[in-house]
Amino acid sequence: MNPDALSDLVLLAACAASAWWVAVGRAAWRGAMLLLGLAAAIGVLRYSGLEWALGPHRFFSVLAACAAFWLMAVALRWPQAPLASQATAVGRFVVLLGGLGIAASQVGAAWWAQVVPGLSALVLAWTMVQQRSALGLLGSVALVASFVVAALAAPDVQLLGMFNRTQALHYLLALAVLLLGQVRLQPAPTAGKPAA
């Protein structure tokens, strides 16, 4: 197995573990892990040399970029929202926002698949700052770092002398989902009652 395929396999395992650890009521988180995991599973095939997997890997990567990261943000920022807790709402969201992202990428607005994850990463980071979650903040930093690597690193550059851009993206995403998946949800403070 080559290093790119191995990095996607690590991401797949991280998504599966994070989805497994999450309680039943967090449908948005599990949906996000499913989308990222599907992209990673097909990526393992792609980077293992199966040419037919290139198209499906690109498709699921764009779908995950447009929907999975917002689902992660919703799961941690608004845990009581129907989108965070209901699988049917997650399915509709993936079809609508993911479909919009796929369509946008096909008509030349490929930036959409970069802006949506970036905004969701900022929402996640702000949420972790507000919740004072050290694990969540580290996970948010790893998530933002993965986007920075994907957007700015040249494909042939070795990062830290060990990883190419693809591998760094996958390992940072794996770290992010493992850390963010461990965040304990705090209920939003109710109006009229001071927070304890």
Regions found by a protein language model. Give the residues of each.
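Hydrophobic cores of alpha-helical transmembrane segments in multi-pass inner/ER membrane proteins
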Residues: D8-W20, L63-P79, L119-W126, H170-P187
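Membrane-interfacial loop-to-transmembrane alpha-helix junctions, especially the N-terminal start
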Residues: V24-L36, A81-F93, R132-L143, T190-A196
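Hydrophobic core segments of alpha-helical transmembrane domains in multi-pass membrane proteins
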Residues: A32-L36, A113-V123, L138-V144, Q167-L173
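Aromatic-anchored segments of alpha-helical transmembrane domains
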Residues: G37-L45, F93-S105, A142-P155
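Membrane-interface helix caps and helix-loop-helix hairpins in membrane proteins
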Residues: G49-G55, G101-A113, D156-F163
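Membrane-proximal helix-loop-helix units in multi-pass membrane proteins
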Residues: R58-M128
